[in-house]
UniProtKB/Swiss-Prot annotation:
<feature type="binding site">
    <location>
        <begin position="284"/>
        <end position="287"/>
    </location>
    <ligand>
        <name>GTP</name>
    </ligand>
</feature>
<dbReference type="Pfam" id="PF01018">
    <property type="entry name" value="GTP1_OBG"/>
</dbReference>
<keyword id="KW-0460">Magnesium</keyword>
<dbReference type="GO" id="GO:0005525">
    <property type="term" value="F:GTP binding"/>
</dbReference>
<feature type="binding site">
    <location>
        <begin position="166"/>
        <end position="173"/>
    </location>
    <ligand>
        <name>GTP</name>
    </ligand>
</feature>
<dbReference type="GO" id="GO:0000287">
    <property type="term" value="F:magnesium ion binding"/>
</dbReference>
<comment type="subunit">
    <text>Monomer.</text>
</comment>
<dbReference type="GO" id="GO:0042254">
    <property type="term" value="P:ribosome biogenesis"/>
</dbReference>
<dbReference type="InterPro" id="IPR036726">
    <property type="entry name" value="GTP1_OBG_dom_sf"/>
</dbReference>
<keyword id="KW-0342">GTP-binding</keyword>
<dbReference type="InterPro" id="IPR031167">
    <property type="entry name" value="G_OBG"/>
</dbReference>
<feature type="binding site">
    <location>
        <begin position="315"/>
        <end position="317"/>
    </location>
    <ligand>
        <name>GTP</name>
    </ligand>
</feature>
<protein>
    <recommendedName>
        <fullName>GTPase Obg</fullName>
        <ecNumber>3.6.5.-</ecNumber>
    </recommendedName>
</protein>
<dbReference type="InterPro" id="IPR014100">
    <property type="entry name" value="GTP-bd_Obg/CgtA"/>
</dbReference>
<comment type="function">
    <text>An essential GTPase which binds GTP, GDP and possibly (p)ppGpp with moderate affinity, with high nucleotide exchange rates and a fairly low GTP hydrolysis rate. Plays a role in control of the cell cycle, stress response, ribosome biogenesis and in those bacteria that undergo differentiation, in morphogenesis control.</text>
</comment>
<feature type="region of interest" description="Disordered">
    <location>
        <begin position="128"/>
        <end position="147"/>
    </location>
</feature>
<dbReference type="InterPro" id="IPR006169">
    <property type="entry name" value="GTP1_OBG_dom"/>
</dbReference>
Length: 366
């Protein structure tokens, strides 16, 4: 299935049914009074996050989603039936924006998360509500209220622990194939990857993490060149970025350091928070470098790139260095999760009784 990560839709909730102005007409009941029922509520439009869906392609073509109107009220105290709700199933990781104001309405990050996109209109009142001691035969009724109507923009940001970042043909697809169950298209020309790929990396019976391989970036990606905006946003939810660098480009005129600096520059221009995200350097295609030149080439790259963070030397093609890389990632993610759990379990200082001079028996100290 083709990966679609943005769509625009219109959601229209159902209108409420009109109330009825009816009088009871029955044999032997000369003054039956009002018996007009209320109109039914209009159907609402809901969204629910579904982990079994991974693309917005259905909403690229089905742009208008309408819920049913409520039925009108009738005589004999018959209330109109409510309009049926409709539910739009969206991938986990979908952000929902108002297309007219660009305001974010919701971010569906949990499977089963549910949200009302457009609420149905309330049904109108029948004339039974207007009966009083001075108005025994009311003719008043109210019409149903219109349902909400919204233009929405759906934006999918993939949920992954690790994001692969790099120039086209840096070997990112080969790397995700080597370490995970993903099988993206691989070829010896740039821009082979045209949409994000997700792969699950298993490091033990109950340990795993998710890697996202986005299409290669080019200079100007932060301004949208090469669909850069669509690709960079998929890295925003990751915990760590792997900057994959081709250390043995076919074109000798290409400088890996200059390309790596260009990628970092695009990150900084696109989003400061993304730029500050933990980033590891992965020097790839070492199998293409003569063995006696590898150490010197690696040191030269690190020196000119002025890199002080973690460095991993690998060959995605031969899998050399890949086991060490994935176990280092798993250890890092485990440490992050342990710190988050410890922070969540820490007692709130505002609830510490010693700060308020309260004894354990509940009495206050002098």
């Amino acid at each position: 299935m083709k990966f679609i990560d943005e769509a625009r839709i219109e959601v229209i909730a159902g209108d409420g049914g009109n109330g009825s102005a009816s009088m009871r007409r029955e044999k032997f009941v000369p003054f039956g009074g009002p018996d007009g029922g209320d109109g039914g509520r209009g159907g609402s439009v809901w969204a629910v996050a579904d982990r079994n869906i991974n693309t917005l392609i259905d909403y690229r073509f089905a742009k208008k989603h309408l819920a049913r109107n409520g039925e009108n009220g009738r005589g004999s105290d018959c209330y109109g039936a409510a309009g049926e709700d409709i539910t739009l199933r969206l991938p986990v990781g979908t952000a929902i924006y108002d297309a007219d104001t660009d305001e974010q309405i919701a971010d569906l990050t949990l499977d089963g998360q549910r949200l009302c996109l457009a609420r149905g209109g309330e049904g109108g009142w029948g004339n039974i509500h207007f009966k009083s001691s001075t108005n025994r035969a009311p003719r008043q009724k109210t019409d149903g209220k219109p349902g909400e109507r919204r233009n929405l923009r759906l934006e999918l940001k993939v949920l992954a622990d690790v994001g692969l970042l790099g120039m086209p043909n840096a070997g990112k697809s080969t790397l995700i194939t080597a370490i995970s169950n993903a099988r993206p298209k691989i070829a010896d020309y740039p821009f082979t990857t045209l949409h994000p790929n997700l792969g699950v990396v298993r490091t033990g019976p109950s340990k795993s993490f998710v890697v996202a391989d986005i299409p290669g970036l080019i200079e100007g990606a932060a301004e949208g060149a090469g669909l850069g905006h669509q690709f960079l946003r998929h890295l925003q939810r990751t915990r760590v970025l792997l900057h994959v660098v081709d250390l043995a480009p076919f074109d000798e005129g290409i400088d890996p350091v200059a390309e790596a600096k260009a990628i970092v520059g695009e990150l900084k221009k696109y989003d400061a928070e993304l730029y500050d995200k933990p980033r590891w350097l992965v020097l790839n295609k070492l199998d293409m470098v003569p063995e006696d030149e590898r150490e010197a080439r690696v040191k030269d790259f690190i020196k000119r790139f002025k890199w002080k963070g973690p460095v991993h030397r690998i060959s995605a093609l031969t899998h050399d260095g890949c086991p060490g890389l994935i176990h280092a990632i798993q250890d890092y993610l485990d440490t992050l999760r342990a710190e988050e759990e410890a922070a969540a379990a820490a007692p709130d200082a505002r609830l510490d009784p010693t700060l308020h001079n309260v004894d354990h028996d509940g009495s206050a100290n002098a």
